Swiss-Prot record:
Catalyzes the conversion of 4-hydroxy-tetrahydrodipicolinate (HTPA) to tetrahydrodipicolinate. (S)-2,3,4,5-tetrahydrodipicolinate binds at residues 154, 163-164. Its main location: cytoplasm. It catalyses: (S)-2,3,4,5-tetrahydrodipicolinate + NAD(+) + H2O = (2S,4S)-4-hydroxy-2,3,4,5-tetrahydrodipicolinate + NADH + H(+); (S)-2,3,4,5-tetrahydrodipicolinate + NADP(+) + H2O = (2S,4S)-4-hydroxy-2,3,4,5-tetrahydrodipicolinate + NADPH + H(+). Keywords: Amino-acid biosynthesis, Cytoplasm, Diaminopimelate biosynthesis, Lysine biosynthesis, NAD, NADP, Oxidoreductase. This is 4-hydroxy-tetrahydrodipicolinate reductase. It comes from the Bacteria. It comes from Paraburkholderia phymatum (strain DSM 17167 / CIP 108236 / LMG 21445 / STM815). CDD domains: DHDPR_N (cd02274). The lineage of its organism: Bacteria, Pseudomonadati, Pseudomonadota, Betaproteobacteria, Burkholderiales.
Length: 265
């Protein structure tokens, strides 16, 4: 399996490269970075002190032409450009980018009719098992409990709330028979009045090098339940992305997420 990495000089990109290089069953076939990036032309393994023979490139079509899969944890505009190129080269996609709007998500769905795509807000096995716990908890705490989602990430993260927090909200809202857009409240300030018990609240923290912390609070009278997942390293995301690649080996097209990959449906 020949795998290319987008955003190859970034924190997640480097972790993906290292994880691919350490897996004897897959091969690093390309490393994409933005035009003008200082790392262009360097060996993709230079940051590890390794020579891979794969040079950092901004030529999307050339990289994907020699790749079976592209793992993309970048930004929405870049990912959409990569999708268009992947359709030209018949390359399958593992997408961990967050911050897409509804129209952009529709483009991903359309692309999945022609190639296999795993699209998820979080590739950690632990986070995806947590999603099932939240679904179960929401059904049992549907009355008399206020629901709040608190997430924390590093200072460089550009979107808030995180894609994972929003997915958690969607899972909870779905379990309660609601739509998230109808019940979400994003942060609070000033005189807000009493809390509407039908809402799901979100709070986002940005600071330091926090990889990703998510806590869902079910607050009742006399008790509260907290379900928390904390990521100490991006390695769990990279390992999950490789599981997604292996899952796509048996799917020529279609849109999937990590619940499909892990058999949690």
């Amino acid at each position: 399996m020949k795998i290319a990495i987008a955003g190859a000089s970034g924190r997640m990109g480097r972790m993906l490269i290292e994880t691919v290089l350490n897996d004897p069953e897959v091969k690093l076939s390309g490393a994409l970075d933005r035009t003008g990036a200082p790392q262009l032309g360097q060996d993709a393994g230079a940051f590890l002190g390794k020579q891979t023979g794969v040079l950092m490139s901004d030529d999307i079509d050339a990289v994907l032409a020699q790749s079976d899969y592209l793992i993309d944890f970048t930004r929405p505009d870049g990912t959409l450009a990569h999708i268009e190129a992947a359709l030209r080269t018949n390359t399958k996609l593992v997408i961990g980018t967050t911050g897409f709007d509804d129209a952009q998500k529709a483009r991903i769905r359309a692309a999945s009719e022609k190639t296999g795509i795993v699209f998820a807000s979080n590739f950690s096995v632990g986070v995806n098992v947590t999603m099932k716990l939240l679904e179960f908890a929401a059904r049992h705490f549907s009355q008399g409990y206020d629901i709040e989602i608190i997430e924390a990430h590093h200072r460089h993260k550009v979107d808030a709330p995180s894609g994972t927090a929003l997915t958690m909200g969607e899972v909870i809202a779905g379990a309660l028979g609601r739509k998230l857009e109808d019940c979400a409240v994003y942060a609070r300030e000033g005189v807000t009045g009493e809390r509407d018990p039908s809402t799901i609240g979100f709070s986002a923290i940005r600071g330091g090098d926090i990889v990703g912390d998510h806590t869902v609070l079910f607050a009742g009278i006399g008790e509260r339940i907290e379900i928390t997942h904390k990521s100490a390293s991006r390695l769990s995301y990279a390992q999950g992305a490789l599981r997604a690649v292996r899952f796509l080996e048996g799917h020529s097209n279609g849109l999937f997420d990590m619940q499909d990959v892990l058999g949690l449906r």
